[in-house]
Amino acid sequence: MIIIVTGTPGVGKTIASKKLSEALNLNYLSLSQFVIENKLYTEYDELRQSYIIDEDKVKEELEKIISTSHLVIETIYPSLVSTADLVVVLRKNPFSLYNELKGRGWADIKVAENVEAEILGVISQEAREAFKDKVCEVDTTEMSTEQILNKILNKQCDGPIEWLVDTKVQRFLEELDKIISSYENDI
């Protein structure tokens, strides 16, 4: 059994994935840690304080593990995983997510890009394109880890979630675009 838990940074992937793996007695794999530990990246992006992954190498190495394991895989890149029985996309209200990421001390550009990705549903769309009806979206806003875990275990999906129906979110997206645009010379 392969379960992918995905979503933008700050939505609760790590703790939910670990709890899910414990509840189902499956191994846990953080794809980010896997990439770093196995040097499956091409460079380090100083501006975003992130590694640029080598997608081909990641897919190749991941395939070796998937073929012999039962896993909960935590990742922001669901399409790098070749197969899954369930794909859980954790979502979070963009305003709440912004506060979460700012609280981590992240650079403004990194916060803005990740919140923009959440608003636009980038990871959700990627998951749906790769895994179609195996996707379950869960809104983690103001939920405890236990509540999130129960929703996943009971496949109580909230999605598809569309943040852009809210005019406040639309205006927020415009502000995020301004932040991102201010970094254009650095990108």
Curated annotation (Swiss-Prot):
Disulphide bridges, residue numbers: none
> Which chemical reaction does it catalyze?
AMP + ATP = 2 ADP; ATP + H2O = ADP + phosphate + H(+)
Q: Gene3D superfamilies of this UniProt entry?
A: P-loop containing nucleotide triphosphate hydrolases
The protein's matches in InterPro entries, at most eight in alphabetical order, are given as:
Adenyl_kinase_AK6 (IPR020618), P-loop_NTPase (IPR027417)
For the protein in the UniProt heading, the enzyme class is transferase
* NMP: region residues: 30-53
**UniProt GO molecular function:** adenylate kinase activity; ATP binding; ATP hydrolysis activity
Which residues are listed for ATP binding in this entry? 10, 12-15, 104
- Enzyme Commission (EC) number: 2.7.4.3
Keywords assigned by UniProt, alphabetized: ATP-binding, Kinase, Nucleotide-binding, Ribosome biogenesis, rRNA processing, Transferase
Q: Which family does it belong to?
A: Belongs to the adenylate kinase family. AK6 subfamily.
Query: What is the protein's quaternary organization?
Result: Interacts with uS11. Not a structural component of 40S pre-ribosomes, but transiently interacts with them by binding to uS11.
Job of this protein:
Broad-specificity nucleoside monophosphate (NMP) kinase that catalyzes the reversible transfer of the terminal phosphate group between nucleoside triphosphates and monophosphates. Also has ATPase activity. Involved in the late maturation steps of the 30S ribosomal particles, specifically 16S rRNA maturation. While NMP activity is not required for ribosome maturation, ATPase activity is. Associates transiently with small ribosomal subunit protein uS11. ATP hydrolysis breaks the interaction with uS11.
Name assigned to this protein = Putative adenylate kinase
